[in-house]
Amino acid sequence: MPSALAAAMADGLRDNPVINYAIAVFIVVALIYLAVLQFWVLLRTRKHLSEMKSAYSEIEIQRSELQLRNKDLTDSLNYARRIQAALLPSEHHIRRIFPDYFIYYRPKHIVSGDFYWFSERDDKYFIAAADCTGHGVPGALMSMIGLELIHKIINDMKVDDSDQVLLTMNRELESAFYKEESGKPIIKDGIEMSICIIDKKTRLMEFSGAFLPVYIVRDDKLIEIKGDKKNVVQSFAMVSFNRSTFTLQDGDLLYLFSDGYADQFGGPDNKKFMYRRLRHILLTISKYPLPDQQRILDETIDSWMEGHDQIDDMMILGVKPF
């Protein structure tokens, strides 16, 4: 009975034109709504795509501008590197003084805050290694000032004592950086530096250091002469530096360096290389020809870094004076 009733009601609905019309209107309205909704979604999608395309174009423009600026900056740094290289002693000049030497010189960026100096005057050899505060452009500018000053102090002012070289450089930098108008130094950066002055006749070496030491390898032993724990132009107060002496023999090796090699992070635990490892490797490789020593130092630090970024400029000088 209920099934027969339901069938009768269904037949009645199909035969009712009002209901059929209402259903048709509902279906048409639903289709129109869906069409409008789809059209609206399409417009929003097109607008979004247009905005994305505009943003992408803007990003491409900015990327092109950044690439151009980076190229300009890199070109400027490369040119600055050539200027810096022109100020550093040439290979021909150094080899004329010390036929047996190497220079491991590895800037963090294109230009370096480390610099070295070799000179010969009045039967004396002059060797210096310096590490200016910072690296990159600021360090390079400071190093260029330091190169000009050491040339002036040793060759023009003819300062012969190692401690006086550091003291004179301190005074020259003080004069350059101190401004009476404000009563304060405009630059507080300093220079870590080591300098050896060797008398060719007596073979007596004078050494003074501002933080940096000198290593001497003789008969499979490493001798360290430490520098003072103060920078050149660390402060503008009255300063002084100690002077040590050491008589060199045939076959002695001198190593001067900045702190970049020892401070480089790496290894299995991402720790600093440290000076004890540097002393060990220098003593180990001291029996090899100096060009081979330079290669081994480069390979060693590359292996130690294991993909880590270089954190500072690196410089190691190896010299056999006699």
Language-model segments: residues:
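Exposed alpha-helical structural elements
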Residues: 8, 72, 82-83, 168, ...
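Active-site-proximal, acidic helix/loop segment immediately C-terminal to a metal-coordinating Asp/Glu
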Residues: 137-160, 248, 252-308
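Non-catalytic regulatory/interaction regions at protein termini and inter-domain linkers
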Residues: 1-14, 290-304, 317
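Residue-level detector of alpha-helix boundaries and kinks
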Residues: 30, 37, 68-69, 154, ...
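N-terminal membrane insertion elements
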Residues: 1-53, 268
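Generic recognition of well-structured, leucine-rich alpha-helical segments
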Residues: 39-41, 176, 285
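… and, occasionally, acidic/histidine-rich disordered N-termini of signaling adaptors
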Residues: 57-254, 308-322
